[in-house]
Structures are given as structure tokens and as C-alpha cells.
Amino acid sequence: MAISVRIHSLLPNGSQRVEVGGRLDTHTYGELDDRLTLVLAAKVQSLVLDLAQLDYVSSAGVRSIFRARKLLAARGGTLVLANTQPQVQKVFDIVKAVPLSEIFRSVEEADAYLDRIQKKILANDED
């Protein structure tokens, strides 16, 4: 099975949503890497990976997501996961590659979290 990657429009607040579906494994991680490289080249401050349609993730897929998270964190950004399927969630639980506080049941929950983070940062800057 192939991977599908759908990139949504960049929001004015610098948040980007990317839907990932299918299988993320040794045969498909390169495509996700390529697409995320394009996304991260923009002025993205927060990235929501919507994994509702992701059926399988291998260690290569975990590395791909971790790489994007690391690149974004290096410039003060945040990567969160939303809508993880139980079998995919189990992989992240086992490898502990993504803190549980950065995995959400829905895109709306992830967006609310990112809004809180940004408001908190702005509030601290004003003090």
C-alpha cells in the first residue's frame, strides 16, 4: 500500500496541517520526508500531523516524524500528532519518540493546544 500526504494551506498564525494516510514504512518514508522538507522550508511555527488514515508505521516512519519534529524544535516550533489509530499509537508508546502530551485525539484538540502555547508565549513576551 502506498502513502498519501495531503498538505493544507498554511494558516496566518504559522500553523500547518498535514494529513498522512496508508503505510509509513521503509518503502514510503522518503516521500513523507520530501513533502515535510517542503513544508518546513516555509515559515511554519507549528505542524499538526493528522494520522487518522495512517494504518501502519515502521521504525523508518517514526524516524521521519522525529526528524521533522527535531528540525522544527531547533527553530522554536512544535510538531504534534492528531487522530492516531490504536496500532500506530502503540508504536509511539513503545518507542517513546513523541511525548504523550503532543499526541491528540483530534485536530481540533491539537489546534487548541497550539493556540494555548502561542498565547502563553505572547503573554510572557509582554511582561
Language-model-detected regions and their locations in the chain:
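STAS-typified acidic loop motif
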Residues: 2-34
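Proteins with a high burden of low-complexity, intrinsically disordered sequence enriched in S/T/G/P/A and R
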Residues: 2-6, 10-13, 37-39, 44-46, ...
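Conserved catalytic submotifs in the C-terminal HATPase_c
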Residues: 12-13, 52, 84, 108
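Residues at the C-termini of beta-strands that transition into short coil/loop
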Residues: 21, 107-108
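Amphipathic alpha-helical interaction surfaces in cytosolic regulatory modules
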Residues: 26-101
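Short acidic-hydrophobic, aromatic-tinged amphipathic segments that line or gate anion-handling sites
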Residues: 102-106
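A charged, well-structured terminal subsegment
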Residues: 108-127
